[in-house]
Amino acid sequence: MSVGCACPGCSSKSFKLYSPKEPPNGNAFPPFHPGTMLDRDVGPTPMYPPTYLEPGIGRHTPYGNQTDYRIFELNKRLQNWTEECDNLWWDAFTTEFFEDDAMLTITFCLEDGPKRYTIGRTLIPRYFRSIFEGGATELYYVLKHPKEAFHSNFVSLDCDQGSMVTQHGKPMFTQVCVEGRLYLEFMFDDMMRIKTWHFSIRQHRELIPRSILAMHAQDPQMLDQLSKNITRCGLSNSTLNYLRLCVILEPMQELMSRHKTYSLSPRDCLKTCLFQKWQRMVAPPAEPARQQPSKRRKRKMSGGSTMSSGGGNTNNSNSKKKSPASTFALSSQVPDVMVVGEPTLMGGEFGDEDERLITRLENTQFDAANGIDDEDSFNNSPALGANSPWNSKPPSSQESKSENPTSQASQ
C-alpha cells in the first residue's frame, strides 16, 4: 500500500509502509554502514517513512534506526532457510545476530500454568531450527510502534505489539500469528548484535484461507480436523519439547564445555564441577572492608625551641620545687593533632578527605605552672623600672597586725 507524502520539503512522491519482508523503501533502504551518520548536507535525503526519519540535530549516535534494520536483516536471513541448512548454517546465523553471552527467554501460559524458559548462546541455534522442524516453512518478526532507548553500552528496543509469524504447509496451509511483547538489547558497537531476547507471548491466532474451507465444506470430518489447532500458544510440539529439554541441557553446558576443553570423562567432569561448586559454598565470606585509621600529622618541633625549653626546665629544677602538674609535659598528655569525624549521614560516614584537623599550639618557652612561685626572677626582670609599683613587696602578716592598733588609737 502506498501513501502520499505531504511534507513541504520532501521530494518523494510516496513511500511504502514497513513490511518485515522488505525494507521501508523497497531496495532503496540505505545499506548498513557502522560508524556513519546521515547528514542533511551530504547528498539527497533518503526516502524514509515517518518511523524511519533521519536522526535529529544534536543526536550523537553513529547510526540511524539501525535496531529496526537489524530485525529486517534477521528476517531476510531467515527467508534464506532451506531444508538443506545444517547446524553450521544455524550457528553462523546465531553468530551474526547474537552475542557470545546472549540469553534468550520465552514466557507463555499453557493449560497447566505459566512457563518460562531461558537458554544461552549455545542452545539458541537449535531453538530457531526447532521452529522449522515443527512444520514451519517461513518465519519472520513484525514490530509495531517499537520504542528505542539508548544506554551506556547497549541500545534497548521495546515493542509491546510484537508478532512472530510462521507459515505451515502441513497438514494444511496455515499462518500462525503469535502476539506479545518483544524486548531486545543490542550491544552499542559496530556489529549491533543482540545480547538479550525476551519474548512474552500473550495470545496467538491460526489463520486458514477461505478457499480451503470452501473446498471441504461438505466434508464434516475434514472440517473437524481444520478446526483443531496445530500449535500450543503458537509454538509447535517440536519447539515445546526442545524448551523442556533445555531445562536439563542449560545446567549441563558447564559439563559439556569442560568435556570438550579438557577431554575428561563425564564422571570426572561432574566430580570437578561439584568440587568447585562445593569450594564456592564453603568458602568463608569476605571480610568487610575495614575503615582506614585516621590520618594524624605530627608537629615537628624546631631545635631552638626544644633546647630552650629543656634548658629552662633544668634551671628551674635546681632553684625550686615544681608543682606536680608541671612534672609532665603538656604535649605528652594531649596529642598534637586531634581528628574530629563528621556526623554520620544516612547510615554512612564521610571519608578522610572530609575530616577536619584541629591543631593545638603551645608556647614551649613559657611554663605558667613554674612561674607562680618564681617571684625573684619576676622582680629582677629588666622590663620593670626602679620605681615600678610591682617592685614593692606586700607587708607581712606581723607588720600588718602591729599597724592595726596604732591606727585604731589615732582614731
Curated annotation (Swiss-Prot):
Q: Which GO terms of the molecular function aspect are on file? A: chromatin binding; DNA-binding transcription factor binding; enzyme binding; identical protein binding; LIM domain binding; protein homodimerization activity; RNA polymerase II-specific DNA-binding transcription factor binding; transcription coactivator activity
Claim: Acetylation is one of the keywords in the record: yes
Q: What is its main location?
A: nucleus
Give the record's GO CC terms.
beta-catenin-TCF complex; cell leading edge; chromatin; nucleoplasm; nucleus; protein-containing complex; RNA polymerase II transcription regulator complex; transcription regulator complex
Question: What InterPro entries does UniProt report for this protein, alphabetically?
Answer: LID, LIM-bd/SEUSS
- PTM: Ubiquitinated by RLIM/RNF12, leading to its degradation by the proteasome.
Q: Which residues in this protein are found as Phosphothreonine? A: T61
**Subcellular location as annotated:** Nucleus
Tell me, what is an example of a GO biological process annotation in this record? cerebellar Purkinje cell differentiation
This protein is called what?
LIM domain-binding protein 1
Q: Which organism is it from?
A: Mus musculus (Mouse)
